[in-house]
Amino acid sequence: VNTRDICTNHKKSFLELKRIYFSKMKGLALVVGSGGIGTQIATDLSKSEKELDVVLCGRKSQFNSFWELDIEDSQSLLQFKSKISNHSSELRLVINSTGRLHSETLKPEKRLQHLDKKNMMESFSINAFSPILLAKAIEEFIPKNSDFNFASISARVGSIGDNQTGGWYSYRAAKSAQNQFFKSLSIEWARRFPKATITLLHPGTVDTDLSRPFHKFVPEHKLFSTEKSSQFLINIIKNQSPASTGKFIAWDSSEIPW
């Protein structure tokens, strides 16, 4: 008997069970962030997970089931909570796909002298503070007796152990802060909500507005379409469980050092 084959088949069976379970998950799924990745994830989930009521949440979208939400605005979050409370389905899945690398005024810093406090605060607001405050907003709706998944898109550049090139001070630090927030939260929720799972995700470099100014530095085979990135991320979320909560995982399912 080949023990390697037994182990491999057992692992495959476990993953298949996870996929089957996820496909039977019933309830409300919220995808927060109506940019390229978020919209694609919401689209793919609504097609593949027929028992989930998928709602895309963000500032604007033509998605068929959409809630307006400014994740950086406390009043908007209160209205968001009211919509969850009034919804008939149990909350089962939240995916945060918000993030900002650049804007008209915000640019990733190449060296120390480029640092600006206002820009640093903007980066931390959307990339660190808002995701954890989103978790705070939805916490009261986490089911006690059903599995619940919260996934947040981070970035490999937020890894301190993986930082080999420097630069991008604010974005790196903000994503590192997000990672620390959710690592701590995964420990708290493991005690309070044993069926909850938190996953931090690195989607790779995706062909969206966030990364578009930097595409020339990315090899063609490492620049993913939103469709491919969505498939990677959904498959990762499907295969997580409370036993693996608090992990920082790349698009290829490899674990990233903190």
Model-predicted regions and their roles:
Residues 25-51:
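Canonical Rossmann dinucleotide-binding motif of NAD(H)/NADP(H)-dependent dehydrogenases/reductases
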Residues 104, 109-119, 147-183, 187-191:
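Catalytic loop of short-chain dehydrogenase/reductase
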